[in-house]
Amino acid sequence: MNQFRAPGGQNEMLAKAEDAAEDFFRKTRTYLPHIARLCLVSTFLEDGIRMYFQWDDQKQFMQESWSCGWFIATLFVIYNFFGQFIPVLMIMLRKKVLVACGILASIVILQTIAYHILWDLKFLARNIAVGGGLLLLLAETQEEKASLFAGVPTMGDSNKPKSYMLLAGRVLLIFMFMSLMHFEMSFMQVLEIVVGFALITLVSIGYKTKLSAIVLVIWLFGLNLWLNAWWTIPSDRFYRDFMKYDFFQTMSVIGGLLLVIAYGPGGVSVDDYKKRW
């Protein structure tokens, strides 16, 4: 495993940083999963509220965009409203999480088609990243089921489905980073791309996962406050809703990263491979 070891000085700095990350995890482990879940479902909660306050506007959009008539447009808005609020409540209460995630995934797919997001690569990347967050949420429930057999000796990775779901969720989070990139040749933009890509790659392969995810959460949160400060925009400006949408979708991905911090990268990761070998 020498290929994963840094030189002496760097190794010492990394060890200190990892110790700090572990200390953070120990202090927050009781409430971090709850914060992670709330962040992850925040985009659905915000969108459900928006559906309620823009009920007529959403129906009109569907009728004009798809020529579907009043009845189908009303069904669309009703499903988007109740299909987000109820699953969010189920997830926060830890009730039928698999069903709740399935409903939320159907909302993501439905909105991707209904709002023509398939042809907007930036918004499509965000939706895919949110799907990755839902996979991480499902993997968390697999972790809870596996814990019923705590204390029983096992060899290797005892929960393959959970490990592959964690891997898929981490990889899909890459799409959030891609949607945030601005290809401008300024020093700060190049620095953002290099640092962000390095961090998201480390999280995806599961190397120094908790440390990388903590740094990425801080980086994404700061970037989110800078790029998507929707509360500074007057309520009569149409792009306020777009900024709010971007803000809460980024918060959902941050929630996914917090789940990675809380539960680790799983069996299909460099960190786990190092432990076993």
From Swiss-Prot:
Motif Di-lysine motif, chain ranges: 274-277
Record GO cellular component, one term: endoplasmic reticulum-Golgi intermediate compartment
Transmembrane segments: 71-91, 97-117, 118-138, 163-183, 187-207, 213-233, 250-270
Membrane topology according to the record: Multi-pass membrane protein
Reported phenotype of the disruption mutant: High rate of embryonic and larval lethality. Some mutants reach adulthood but display severe accumulation of vit-2 in large granule-like structures in intestinal cells.
This protein's record includes keyword Protein transport: yes
Annotated compartments: Endoplasmic reticulum membrane
Chief site of localization: endoplasmic reticulum
A Pfam family annotated for this UniProt entry: SURF4
InterPro entries cross-referenced by the UniProt entry: Surf1/Surf4, Surf4
Top-rank taxon: Eukaryota
Entry GO MF terms: cargo receptor activity
Keywords recorded for this protein, A-Z: Endoplasmic reticulum, Membrane, Protein transport, Transmembrane, Transmembrane helix, Transport
GO process terms (BP): Golgi organization; negative regulation of epidermal growth factor receptor signaling pathway; negative regulation of vulval development; nematode larval development; positive regulation of protein catabolic process; protein exit from endoplasmic reticulum
Domains: entry comment: The di-lysine motif confers endoplasmic reticulum localization for type I membrane proteins.
Role according to the record: Endoplasmic reticulum cargo receptor that mediates the export of the yolk proteins from intestinal cells by recruiting cargos into COPII vesicles to facilitate their secretion. Required for the endoplasmic reticulum export of the yolk protein vit-2, which is synthesized as a lipoprotein complex, from intestinal cells. Involved in endoplasmic reticulum exit sites (ERES) organization.
Protein family: Belongs to the SURF4 family.
Protein name: Surfeit locus protein 4 homolog
Lineage: Eukaryota, Metazoa, Ecdysozoa, Nematoda, Chromadorea
Gene it is expressed from: sft-4
